């Protein structure tokens, strides 16, 4: 199979730019013949990517088939404010040569949830529409759990500033975390496979640890004598409060999903597909919570406050 041409939609965004950066590394470049960054406008970021070997195409709802011309693999990283645009892009795919499509998932596996939420419902709708519109294109949903860089903060109960971690439910329940860079490196392996052999769902986990274990890791890195206080709140009461006061953002929902083991991408949890990419040329190793602890002196998001 010849090396594919790969396009990243939303390639200058938070996740998209990290994926592009990883795909541009020397270990990934031989795996595809062209890397195309799809962006709404030129910017310092697009010029930087061009200088590193990527092609840049400016796209809009009016030129999507042309923007995707010659593309074999499409990685969609368009964010939550772009659902209408994502649908337009999906409707353009039958007019293209795309053979493998990674929709904008990359977080938690919300298909196991038993409650509605606007953000995740929009992703479910997108997937159902994709099944209808592009039955001949392989669709692979990649779930990374929580992003390692963004998750050990007070929004998920990790209140570093006040040396207090609060778990919902048991502090010994494991949750999976994956760095955005590792998502990019994993995609760099998956996109080179025969599309028919790419799983419809891929659960990744750079590291899987409990709140109690993370507290110990951060304490060891900070070297502070008093250490982090670990407490827990009632899962039933917390979940009832969240449902009684719905929010458009997912943070509070994610906290009880952590407690229920629904972000546990291990063999004992939702399953783990790390073996699909581990051992591939240049993949290296996953970034861990110990790595994050060393980088931050045991104090990730140490100045952050949260309501």
Where are these predicted regions, by residue range?
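Oxidoreductase cofactor-interface core, primarily capturing Rossmann-like NAD(P)-dependent enzymes
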Residues: 2-33, 38-45, 84, 109-227, ...
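Structural motif
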Residues: 5, 72-73, 100
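Structured loop/turn residues at beta-strand edges in well-structured enzyme cores
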Residues: 30, 69, 96, 137, ...
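NAD(P)H-binding glycine-rich loop region in Rossmannoid oxidoreductase-like domains
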Residues: 37-96, 108-114
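Conserved residues at the C-terminal ends of beta-strands
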Residues: 77, 104, 145
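Short beta-strand elements of ligand-binding domains
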Residues: 99-105
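A generic structural motif
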Residues: 227-237
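A hydrophobic C-terminal alpha-helical subdomain
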Residues: 235-307
């Amino acid at each position: 199979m010849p090396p594919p041409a790969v396009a990243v939609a939303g390639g200058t965004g938070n996740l998209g730019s990290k994926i592009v950066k990883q795909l541009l590394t020397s270990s990934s470049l031989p795996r595809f013949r062209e890397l195309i960054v799809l962006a709404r406008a030129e910017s310092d970021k697009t010029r930087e990517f061009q200088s590193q070997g990527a092609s840049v195409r400016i796209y809009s709802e009016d030129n999507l088939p042309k923007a995707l011309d010659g593309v074999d693999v499409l990685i969609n990283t368009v964010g939550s404010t772009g659902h209408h645009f994502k649908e337009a892009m999906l409707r353009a795919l039958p007019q293209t040569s795309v053979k493998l499509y990674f929709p904008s998932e990359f977080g938690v596996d919300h298909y196991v949830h038993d409650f509605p939420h606007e953000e995740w419902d929009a992703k479910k709708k997108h997937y159902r529409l994709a099944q209808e519109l592009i039955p001949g294109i392989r669709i692979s949903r990649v779930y990374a759990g929580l992003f390692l860089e963004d998750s050990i903060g007070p929004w998920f109960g990790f209140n570093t500033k006040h040396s207090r971690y609060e778990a919902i439910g048991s502090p010994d329940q494991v949750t999976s975390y994956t760095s955005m860079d590792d998502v990019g490196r994993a995609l760099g392996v998956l996109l080179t496979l025969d599309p028919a052999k790419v799983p419809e769902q891929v659960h990744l986990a750079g590291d899987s640890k409990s709140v109690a274990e993370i507290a110990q890791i951060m304490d060891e890195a900070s070297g502070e004598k008093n250490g982090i206080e670990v407490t827990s709140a009632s899962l039933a009461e917390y979940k009832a409060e969240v449902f009684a006061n719905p929010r458009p953002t997912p943070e509070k929902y994610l906290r009880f999903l952590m407690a229920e083991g629904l972000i546990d991408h291990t063999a004992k949890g939702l399953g783990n597909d790390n073996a699909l990419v581990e051992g591939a040329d240049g993949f290296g190793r996953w970034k861990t919570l110990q790595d994050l602890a060393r980088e931050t002196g045991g104090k990730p998001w140490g100045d952050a406050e949260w309501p």
